[in-house]
Amino acid sequence: MSEKNKSDMLRAPFKLEYDYERSTGPIIGKFFEGLSNQQILGTKNGDNVYVPAAEFDPITYEHLSEFVELPETGTVKSFTWIDQPRKHHLINKPFAFALIQIDGATSSILHMITNCNESDIEAVSYTHLTLPTIRL
């Protein structure tokens, strides 16, 4: 191609991108909406209640759509105490990651517990959850 022909070429700016915002979907979205309203919502199938809300029953693989509200209390099944949080942690003071089975739920949820000492938490202890303030 000659230099003259190159300068006669039509040019247009082009940017390859795919604009997409994450969607939580109808099940987890409703669970997060419940948290923003200070409610713990689980999904139910028969006698089983899953928290956090599950889209499918992990045993029967059935689609779940029935929601139930649960209390803000549960049993600590296990925990890990973080005495010296690192930069990647969301909290900059000692805290615990605790696996808590909410009263009335079949499954457990991972929750961060603050404003306590390691000696205040025992596995298989009863606790009251403090729900975070969530803005959707």
What is each stretch, according to the model?
Residues G74-V76:
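Conserved hydrophobic positions within beta-strands
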Residues S108-N117:
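Beta-strand/loop nucleic-acid-binding surfaces
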Residues R86-H88, N92-L99:
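Short aromatic-glycine-enriched beta-strand elements
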Residues N117-Y126:
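Short nucleic-acid-contacting surface segments enriched for D/E, G, S/T with interspersed K/R
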Residues N37-P71:
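Cys/His-rich short segments
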Residues T80-P85:
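Short, conserved beta-turn/loop elements at beta-strand boundaries and strand-helix junctions
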